[in-house]
């Protein structure tokens, strides 16, 4: 009887082992197939050239090396490619003394290019990474050119905002009460479900943080001469925001980029706090990596 039980256990263990191996094979076979059979696709670097009115592409081609062409198939030398993308290669054109005075009849200068151009990048790892929930609030109007990191950090709880002195690890009750009352007066409902800023001194100016309160309403919070600045930002009818990106670009025309629960993309303008829906295709920040480059010498009504 004992021998029979041992045989049954051995048989069960063997069956379980084979089943486990089968599941592992089913799980790994698609990956192995893709690894050994599927060739990686090389997506060419692509920008729109308003000089030629078409897309310009640069990529590696087998036996040819780096090839620069437009969507119509015309091939360009490296210097010619620089010329049809003057807003992107303006440093090279300046070095070669080939930067144009006008583009499509519009006067341009290197200063305008540096001010108006920007890059925006969003990757899922930034969105999905866990947060420690402690944020430094810089002084936005210190009167000095260089920004300075504060001696404290803040967190937002269900009761309010707390400022914690990093040296003593103690709560600054007076400052916490001052900011909590300022936020409550603007009808901020604690806690915050989204807190977004750029806590670094390696930027030209500071706009503090954008917040979504417990009801997903949008607020702007910053510190101005030691006092709280809180602005409730009205949302268009039916808009429910999901993710926020504080921009702090050089031209100061844009305060933030926003996405809603349907992954549509919006611009929050500075000063007016107007929210404008863009024509950029929807993307899910939690799963999709995107990169946008704004290369315009002048502003139009449809610019970001």
Which residues make up each language-model segment?
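Surface-exposed loop/turn elements that mediate protein-protein interactions on large endomembrane-trafficking
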Residues: 111-132, 163-189, 220-235, 264-283
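Hydrophobic membrane-insertion alpha-helices, especially the h-region
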Residues: 14-31
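Secondary-structure-rich domain cores
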Residues: 188, 195-237, 247
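Repeated scaffold domains used in trafficking and secretory/extracellular systems
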Residues: 136-144, 190-199, 239-248, 281-292
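Short beta-strand elements that form the blades of beta-propeller/WD-repeat-like
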Residues: 54-77, 82, 86, 91, ...
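Alpha-helical transmembrane signal-anchor/signal-peptide segments
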Residues: 31-55
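Conserved small/polar residues in nucleotide/adenosyl-binding loops
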Residues: 1-11, 293-300
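Membrane-proximal extracellular "stem/stalk" segments
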Residues: 274-304
């Amino acid at each position: 009887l004992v021998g029979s039980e041992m045989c049954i256990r051995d048989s069960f263990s063997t069956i379980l082992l084979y089943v486990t191996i089968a599941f592992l094979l089913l799980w790994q076979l698609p990956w192995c197939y893709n690894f050994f059979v599927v060739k990686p696709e090389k997506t060419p670097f692509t920008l729109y050239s308003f000089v030629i009115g078409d897309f310009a592409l640069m990529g590696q081609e087998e036996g040819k090396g780096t090839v620069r062409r437009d969507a119509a198939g015309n091939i360009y030398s490296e210097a010619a490619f620089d010329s049809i993308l003057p807003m992107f290669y303006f440093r090279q054109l300046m070095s070669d003394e080939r930067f144009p005075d006008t583009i499509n009849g519009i006067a341009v200068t290197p200063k305008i290019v540096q001010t108006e151009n920007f890059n925006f990048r969003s990757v899922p790892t930034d969105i999905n990474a866990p947060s420690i929930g402690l944020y430094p609030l810089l002084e936005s109007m210190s009167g000095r050119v260089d920004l300075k990191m504060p001696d404290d950090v803040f967190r937002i709880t269900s009761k309010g905002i707390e400022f914690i002195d990093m040296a003593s690890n103690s709560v600054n009750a007076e400052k916490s009460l001052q900011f909590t009352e300022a936020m409550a007066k603007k009808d901020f409902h604690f806690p915050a479900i989204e807190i977004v800023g750029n806590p670094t001194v390696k930027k030209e100016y500071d706009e503090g943080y954008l917040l979504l309160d417990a009801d997903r309403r949008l607020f702007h919070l910053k510190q101005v001469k030691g006092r709280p600045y809180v602005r409730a930002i009205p949302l268009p009818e039916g808009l429910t925001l999901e993710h926020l990106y504080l921009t702090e670009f050089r031209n100061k025309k844009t305060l933030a980029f926003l996405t809603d629960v349907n992954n549509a993309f919006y611009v929050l303008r500075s000063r007016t706090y107007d929210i404008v829906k863009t024509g950029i295709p929807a993307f899910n920040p939690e799963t999709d990596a995107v990169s946008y480059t704004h290369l315009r010498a002048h502003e139009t009504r449809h610019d970001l």
